[in-house]
A protein has these predicted regions:
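Secretory/organelle targeting and membrane-embedding segments
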Residues: 1-215
Length: 215
């Protein structure tokens, strides 16, 4: 029920909230029509109009032909009203990243004062890597947990029909816009227009584990 409530609170996105892309050479793939408008990449901005998330932008992207397969959620924290550091100190926002691919990890990046009398700050990282801390102890395979839940009658991780319908109600109007996909090179991170989409909020995409795959 709670997942359905969240979808019901999602504000309908428009043409200014989405960027479509298509990797170079897509139209030359076997079975692809030369006049195809099918994208291979999408970046989207959404807002959830409820008391908890009002005014907070959610950015998501997915695509094919990118540098690596990465699955992660990154949260950028707002600056507090009263900063501990002087206003002339250039502070980057704090970030928390939850990664599941290519490896399970949690990363926290925050600013800290450098030792000494001056007021200099530097971003530092605190990391947890499942494989490093637990060695060969294997996590359940992708469908192992779902199969076990199905046998036990636990539907918590499954998607209900009304949830699917609500999700498509948000996506269908975007597909009807017939936007032209922007071309991007194979092995990159998508079209430049996706960077412009998120830059409006003074944010940037983190390319795997808080940018480690880009460094």
């Amino acid at each position: 029920d709670e997942k359905v409530k969240v979808l019901q609170a999602v504000r309908q996105a428009g043409a200014d909230d989405i960027v479509l892309g298509r990797y170079e050479g897509y139209l030359q793939e076997d079975g692809v029509a030369t006049d195809s408008r099918t994208p291979s990449y999408a970046a989207l901005r959404l807002y959830i109009d409820n008391w908890r998330w009002q005014g907070v932008p959610f950015y998501m992207r997915s695509g094919k032909g990118l540098t690596a397969k990465v699955t992660e959620i990154t949260m950028q924290f707002k600056h507090v009203p009263h900063l501990l550091f002087p206003e002339n100190v250039d502070l980057m926002p704090n970030h928390l990243s939850l990664c599941s691919q290519p490896e399970e990890a949690i990363h926290l990046r925050f600013a800290t004062k450098l030792p000494g009398a001056g007021m200099r700050v530097k971003p530092v990282d605190m990391d947890f890597h499942y494989a490093q801390d637990f060695g060969d102890t294997a996590l359940p395979a992708a469908y192992e947990r779902l199969l076990l839940d199905a046998m036990q009658g636990d539907a918590a991780l499954f998607t209900r029909g009304d949830e699917i319908e609500l999700a498509w109600e948000l996506i269908d109007p975007l597909t009807e816009l017939e936007l032209t996909p922007h071309t991007y090179p194979v092995g990159g991170w998508g079209p430049e227009q996706a960077d412009d989409l998120i830059a409006v909020e003074n944010c940037s995409w983190h390319c795997g584990c808080l940018g480690r795959l880009q460094e």
